[in-house]
Swiss-Prot record:
One of its GO terms (molecular function) is nucleic acid binding. Gene3D superfamilies: Vaccinia Virus protein VP39. This is Ribosomal RNA large subunit methyltransferase G. Its EC number is 2.1.1.174. GO terms for cellular component: cytoplasm. Belongs to the methyltransferase superfamily. RlmG family. The keyword Methyltransferase applies. It comes from Shewanella pealeana (strain ATCC 700345 / ANG-SQ1). Its main location: cytoplasm.
Length: 413
């Protein structure tokens, strides 16, 4: 993995998050370089700037390298982006004092004079972000959007004009272009959440714009709903919860359980919270909060005493636009570490991802619960053995380059 970022005289060391990933993926792309180069070429001054969708801090670190006190507002929906940016700033000895951190639903500051933005994969979410900016940007404010050249077309420029102001694209550099949009000062209506029903499970679902499966039940979730685990579970985690549908149905099946919804996307966590309230799933026979909602990097920051007896998991295999299996690895390892002895990890995934190999390595057991032509449901049980637990704990050592390194031996040089 390349970690040395170099453009227009700026030199940085940047890592993806978590930094122990063992992959060929790097923490930035050429569009990040193009945006920084554009600012330097145009001699941009250090005015109040919003940085939107900065994957792991390349843009933020670049700006602070130009001026350590550049006033910045950082917007992201991904907790791993926030954590990765913070780590990279610390790694490069750049102060965070001039930064205001916001998620994609927080109120934006009224004084923004420039916007730097990376084009996200989800164009509905992109439109939502442009609509948000239209509420705070005065007419004439410049918005610079970095993207792969192949992603930029007439339709995209029309979308930008419709939601914020007229836009044009630069010449291509390293297969990327910078779109310059000039805000027209007209506030657009913010999009409403998409709502739909799952009548066979008597559930109503509401999705915000950056949540997977925006307006229908995805195939993986459906097979999972049809094949919930058997048992008597009291503490259940919906890990990578999305809109929360697995956890919602788990509460229907196990009404005595407390459900914990966790996702890297703040919009997903907010959608799960809304769906819990929408479906009125609290059991009057139980005391205390029956559902918790965490915007977090898997189970990283759960208290050490937290010991669920069931983890439901439909792992993503994308981080931004990158295809990677490290998220599944981290989910499985976190589940093993946190589950009580005898607890169950119940996983759905595409057959070609071969999750059974990973689960067998970590849990030393794996059972196929159900399958169809595309998906498979797997189940692994935590059977506590000191040597086995010690082996997995090594995978979380800060010196370990990748979550599965302790299971596979040393990474390749």
């Amino acid at each position: 993995m390349t970690t040395q970022f170099s453009v227009s005289g700026i030199e940085l060391e940047l890592f993806r998050y978590p930094s122990r990933q063992e992959s060929n993926l790097q923490a930035w792309d050429a569009a990040d370089e193009h945006l920084i180069k554009h600012l330097i070429d145009t001699e941009q001054t250090s005015i109040s700037t919003a940085v939107v969708n900065d994957g792991f801090g390349a843009l933020t670190a670049g700006l602070l390298s130009i001026n350590p006190s550049w006033p910045l507002t950082l917007e992201t929906d991904a907790k791993t982006s926030q954590l990765g940016t913070s780590q990279n700033l610390t790694r490069n000895q750049l102060s965070q004092e001039s930064i205001t951190w916001v998620n994609s639903r927080d109120e934006l500051p009224q004084v923004i004079e420039l916007v730097l933005m990376k084009l996200p994969k989800n164009l509905n979410y992109f439109s939502h972000q442009l609509n948000r900016l239209s509420h705070v940007l005065p007419a004439g404010t410049q918005v610079l959007i970095g993207a792969k050249a192949k992603s930029i077309n007439k339709s995209l420029l029309e979308t930008i004009e419709k939601n914020l102001g007229p836009a044009s694209a630069s010449l291509t550099w390293k297969k990327t272009r910078v779109i310059t949009c000039i805000a027209d000062g007209k506030a657009r209506a913010l999009p409403k959440a998409t709502t739909w029903s799952v009548p066979e499970f008597k559930l109503q679902i509401s999705n915000l714009s950056n949540v997977f499966a925006a307006n229908k039940l995805d195939i993986g979730a459906r097979i999972m709903l049809d094949n919930m685990p058997k048992g008597d579970y009291k503490s259940i985690v919906d890990l990578g919860c999305g809109n929360g549908i697995l956890g919602l149905h788990a509460k229907q099946v196990f009404p005595e359980a407390y459900i914990h919804f966790i996702d890297d996307s703040e919009m997903a966590v907010a959608s799960a919270r809304e769906n819990w309230a929408l479906n009125k799933l609290d059991n009057p026979a139980l005391v205390g909060e029956q559902a918790t909602f965490g915007w977090d990097d898997c189970l990283t920051n759960m208290s050490e005493g937290f010991r669920p007896d069931l983890v439901l998991c439909n792992p993503p295999f994308h981080q931004g636009e990158a295809i990677t299996d490290h998220i599944a690895w981290q989910m499985f390892l976190d589940a093993f570490r946190r589950l009580k002895n005898g607890g169950i990890l119940h996983v759905v995934g595409n057959r070609h991802l071969a999750y059974h190999v990973k689960l067998q390595r970590i849990f030393k057991n794996c059972t196929t619960v159900a399958s169809n032509g595309k998906f498979v449901i797997l189940q692994a049980q935590k059977i506590s053995k000191k040597a086995q637990e010690a082996e997995v704990e090594q995978a979380f050592d800060t010196e370990t380059p990748h979550p599965q390194s302790a299971l596979y031996g040393k990474p390749k040089a």
